[in-house]
Amino acid sequence: MAGTARGCGTSLDLLRSLPRVSLANLKPSPNSRKRERRPRDRRRGRKCGRGHKGERQRGTRPRLGFEGGQTPFYIRIPKYGFNEGHSFRHQYQPLSLRRLQYLIDLGRVDPTQPIDLTQLVNGRGVTIQPLKRDYGVQLVEEGADTFQAKINIEVQLASELAIAAIEKNGGVVTTAFYDPRSLEILCKPIPFFLRGQPIPKRMLPPESLVPYYTDAKNRGYLADPAKFPEARLELAMKFGYVLPDITKDELFRMLSARKDPRQIFFGLAPGWVVNMADKKILKPTDENLLKYYSS
């Protein structure tokens, strides 16, 4: 009897020294948990999420688009070429006259200098991505009533009303084509100059765009310059405004500046190397190089 009392006292002393029993230190009895089955798909288990028997579990469901034997929808309806050649289409980022006037008012675009993609991209006016089939900027007529700047701008496409709004203020518009390599160099000139490579020739437009850029009505850079005065006068008569005489303007030299069809930058000819470290321009002297870059 005394031994039993001594054993109970020892057990109670042991319980007093042990940590208190709580939900945090409870453990299940050994072998009381049933082990979860994990065949193949560990997330689904057992039937792998396919359910019991039938067509869905055995994997014999019909293919996508099968309509039980009748002629499916995608064969009944004829095909139309709405998206034919979509991977080869050129994309042009829109630039409205309202946005252009906003950039000029903020001083992000200088109207006293010829404006091309270099100024527009550096002024954060547009974002051009040649790798995503962007081929430049399309000038749209939004904000034509409030546009007041006198500029010499070069874009890739321009609407008729946008051209009229600029020429009404005594400005000049030129539409020009740039191949992807020339476009990337024009948008990011500093990284190209740091590589120390000669400025390449600008490629001519593809056959499908030749009619557009050789038409004076579109102010194409390949059009006959002698036809421009007639086209400008015709557009002024159509929209009913007096065409200013830019030859008497004090900014005539800036307004008459145009690039050569093979030229990428204003004032820099193909074949020249811009040395950013020494701040010098290196020009080729070899006859073969001069003949190549001038052709």
Swiss-Prot record:
Q: Which SUPFAM superfamilies match?
A: Ribosomal proteins L15p and L18e
> Is Ribonucleoprotein among this UniProt entry's keywords?
yes
Asked if the keyword Mitochondrion belongs to this entry, the reply reads yes
**Which segment is the transit peptide?**
1-20
Compositional bias, Basic residues, is annotated for 32-51
Q: Where are the transmembrane segments?
A: none
Primary localization: mitochondrion
Which cysteines in this chain are paired by disulphide bridges?
none
Q: Which UniProt keywords apply?
A: Mitochondrion, Ribonucleoprotein, Ribosomal protein, Transit peptide
Short name of any one Pfam family annotated for the protein: Ribosomal_L27A
Please give the InterPro entries that the UniProt record associates with this protein. Answer: Ribosomal_uL15, Ribosomal_uL15/eL18, Ribosomal_uL15/eL18_sf, Ribosomal_uL15_bac-type
Q: Where is this region: Disordered?
A: 21-67
Q: Which GO terms describe its cellular component?
A: mitochondrial inner membrane; mitochondrial large ribosomal subunit; mitochondrion
The record's subcellular location field reads: Mitochondrion
Similarity remark: Belongs to the universal ribosomal protein uL15 family.
Q: How does it assemble?
A: Component of the mitochondrial ribosome large subunit (39S) which comprises a 16S rRNA and about 50 distinct proteins.
The molecule here is called Large ribosomal subunit protein uL15m
